[in-house]
Amino acid sequence: MADSFNFELVSPERLLLSASATEVVIPATEGEMTVMANHAPTMTTVKPGVVTVKTADGKTERFAVFGGFADILPTGCTLLAESAVHVDELDRTVLENRIDEARAELEGAIDEKKTRIEQFIAELTTLGEIVIPA
């Protein structure tokens, strides 16, 4: 059996998952990152995408996250998401509302903030294409 570690996915609204995991794939801003037991200590920012968790009991859980930070230690990983939802609970309306909110914020934005919001909208659009069937 593979080594396991403690994983927690937390959003401002609630604790979404606290489990013993064998592998977690995180959509880090530098690219997808796979976390396993005894991982080197790392902190990374998280972009909108899908977090895939393989639990120690063999289940696979998928969550859509909308940005955040991951704190990775050899004994565990905590992902603090700006917002997150289980993929099974994500629907087109939720995603379209998030995109509309970002577009509204884009109207008054300039320079670097405008670029960040445009990138966020692109990431949300891609996320929708990945997890929501047409």
UniProtKB/Swiss-Prot annotation:
Gene Ontology MF: a single term: ATP binding
Record's keyword terms, sorted: ATP synthesis, Cell inner membrane, Cell membrane, CF(1), Hydrogen ion transport, Ion transport, Membrane, Transport
SUPFAM superfamilies in the record: Epsilon subunit of F1F0-ATP synthase N-terminal domain (SSF51344)
Any single Gene Ontology cellular-component annotation: plasma membrane
Tagged with keyword Nucleotide-binding: no
Gene3D superfamilies: F0F1 ATP synthase delta/epsilon subunit, N-terminal (2.60.15.10)
Keyword GTP-binding: no
Record's subcellular location: Cell inner membrane
Membrane topology: Peripheral membrane protein
Function: Produces ATP from ADP in the presence of a proton gradient across the membrane.
Subunit note: F-type ATPases have 2 components, CF(1) - the catalytic core - and CF(0) - the membrane proton channel. CF(1) has five subunits: alpha(3), beta(3), gamma(1), delta(1), epsilon(1). CF(0) has three main subunits: a, b and c.
Annotated family: Belongs to the ATPase epsilon chain family.
Protein name: ATP synthase epsilon chain
Species this protein is from: Sinorhizobium fredii (strain NBRC 101917 / NGR234)
Gene assigned in the entry: atpC
